[in-house]
A protein has these predicted regions:
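Conserved small-residue-rich
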Residues: 91-152, 354
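Local cysteine-cluster metal-coordination motifs and their immediate loop/turn environment
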Residues: 107-117, 365-368, 412-430
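N-terminal pre-core extensions flanking Radical SAM catalytic domains
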Residues: 1-120
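Short, small/polar residue-rich loop motifs at catalytic or cofactor-binding pockets
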Residues: 348-352
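Radical SAM/AdoMet-radical enzyme domain recognition
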Residues: 117, 129-150, 157-288
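Short Fe-S-cluster ligation motifs
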Residues: 135-151, 441-469
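C-terminal accessory region of radical SAM enzymes
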Residues: 292-335, 362-363, 367-418, 462
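Short, acidic, Ser/Thr-enriched surface-loop or helix-capping motifs
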Residues: 27, 357-358
Length: 469
């Protein structure tokens, strides 16, 4: 039998983590897939030097090689072809995290009424340039290959280009930049493209008729962000948005969604305004929307979403998700089928894959927790323990790896609920907003959805209009 040599194609790199040793990374999008032991063995043989025809390798493993070629992952080569240094196997001695959602500053040039971190007052400040650079090194050395940058307003950092340069030099992809749009201009987009980065710009828009200006505390804020959306569309940068719903803008939901669609925005998440300490101090409870009213607003609106041609991908909290141009929908509240065995699933799939780093360097499951001062104290500062330890043995790691069976054990209401499987624990940040601020409490929004039979109400409302997927 003639000798056979294979080489991994250059976009692909071999990676491994604690408890997930068999990973295949794809450049430059930095997506990673985990495979079984035999497939990874076959991938490891694709080094340009190993004769894969040798009978010492099991037939089961050798039979995988032609499939890798068909899929464009590897190719047949001559002896001596070599992997690049980046392609060679790297094993990270910590648990896997896909993305770091990073507040690189707590400072902001706007005065939003509901800010989680009171950014107008810069309550959490920002880390020094040297510390930020060291954290990028740690992110790289822990195998985190994607970051999204937020704040405060991330673009107010004077060393923002240095951050982009350092991330890019380490092949870390910037997936999103969360901005208010004020500093989004041609020069910024040129700089990002120069480093090979083309992130989505996620910019909040809280309604037509001056509502965005009112919530953000800046004159012409609405005009500014719509121009930023237009510029990104012209330059080929994807855009997304978030809309905070309250008593003053609830009647503008349909109109505002259509405005975003007209400006090329590809997706929007709608949620009620968070009753942060700043919101309650500056605006008050009377301007908030209770969950019961919120669901009725959503229920009234969803037929119009389809009537208006599904202008963007839309998420109405956990109540509804519809894709741009699609005639079907799904309900994020519905995590698992009623008969599924999900007891060993983590409390939150998003939190298990995405680390949130606060402006002071605190490791949190999500940005929403940054408004709960007492809860934050339970989680580590990466500047004190280091990222590797934080992703190995910490209160942060313990929480994001907590399983549903543990929630059901400590929360008897959830544990005995007939909807517990479909709900799958719902949202822990939402649970914190209920009286008692209990991280392992009930998510009142999910309780209302299931207990109030909104699944049936939604089906009836969309009968003949759209099908649930």
């Amino acid at each position: 039998m003639s000798r056979q040599y294979y080489l991994l194609n250059e976009p692909f790199c071999l990676r491994g983590y604690e408890m997930l040793p068999y990973g295949l990374l794809h450049r430059p999008d930095n997506s990673i897939g985990f495979v079984d032991k035999d497939t990874f063995w076959a991938l490891s043989l694709c080094d340009g030097k190993t004769d894969c025809s040798l009978p010492i390798f099991p037939e089961k493993v050798r039979s995988i090689l032609p499939e890798l070629v068909k899929k464009g992952i590897a190719r047949v080569c001559e002896y001596g072809a070599a992997l690049t240094a980046d392609q060679q196997y790297r094993k990270y001695e910590n648990r896997y995290i896909r993305t770091a959602h990073w507040s690189i500053t707590g400072k902001c040039n706007y005065r939003c009424r509901h800010c989680y971190m009171s950014a107008p007052e810069a309550k959490l400040g920002e880390l020094s340039h040297e510390t930020i650079m060291d954290l990028i090194r740690q992110i790289d050395e822990c195998g985190i290959t994607q970051v999204s940058l937020t704040g405060g307003e991330p673009l107010v950092r004077s060393d923002f280009e240095d951050i982009v340069r350092e991330l890019s030099s380490r092949k870390i992809r910037i997936t999103q930049i969360y901005s208010n749009g004020f500093l989004v201009n041609e020069k910024l987009l040129d700089m990002l493209e120069g480093y090979g980065q083309k992130p989505e710009f996620n910019m909040s828009y809280d309604g037509d008729e001056g509502m965005h200006d009112w919530l953000r505390g800046i004159d012409r804020a609405g005009e500014i962000v719509l121009k930023a959306f237009d510029l990104c569309a012209q330059r080929g940068f994807p855009t997304g948005s978030e809309l905070c719903l309250h008593q003053r803008n609830k009647h503008l939901l349909r109109q505002s969604i259509n405005t975003l669609g007209a400006h090329g925005v590809s997706s929007c998440k709608v949620n009620p305004v968070s009753e942060t300490e700043l919101w309650l101090r500056t605006t008050g409870e009377h301007a908030s929307i209770e969950i019961e009213e919120l669901f009725e607003i959503y229920l009234d609106y969803v037929p119009h979403f389809f009537e208006d041609g599904m202008p963007l991908s839309l998420m109405l909290g956990g109540f509804f998700w519809g894709g741009k141009g699609r005639r079907d929908y799904r309900v994020p509240f519905e995590k698992y089928p009623a008969d599924a065995d999900c007891s060993r699933m983590t409390l939150c799939g998003h939190a298990r894959n995405t680390l949130y780093l606060s402006p002071e360097g605190r490791m949190l499951p999500c940005l929403s927790l940054s408004s709960f001062d007492e809860i934050q104290k339970d989680f580590p500062l990466v500047t004190e323990i280091g990222l590797k330890t934080g992703l190995t043995d910490s209160s942060y790691m313990k929480l994001i790896d907590t399983r549903l069976e543990e929630l059901w054990e400590v929360n008897k209401t959830c544990g005995s609920c007939q909807y517990r499987t479909r709900c799958g624990g719902s949202c822990r940040a939402s649970a914190l907003c209920t009286p008692g601020n209990d991280l392992m409490g009930c998510d009142r929004a999910a309780c209302l959805y299931f207990g109030g039979h909104y699944d049936q109400k939604l089906r009836e409302k969309l009968s003949g209009i759209a099908e649930i997927s």
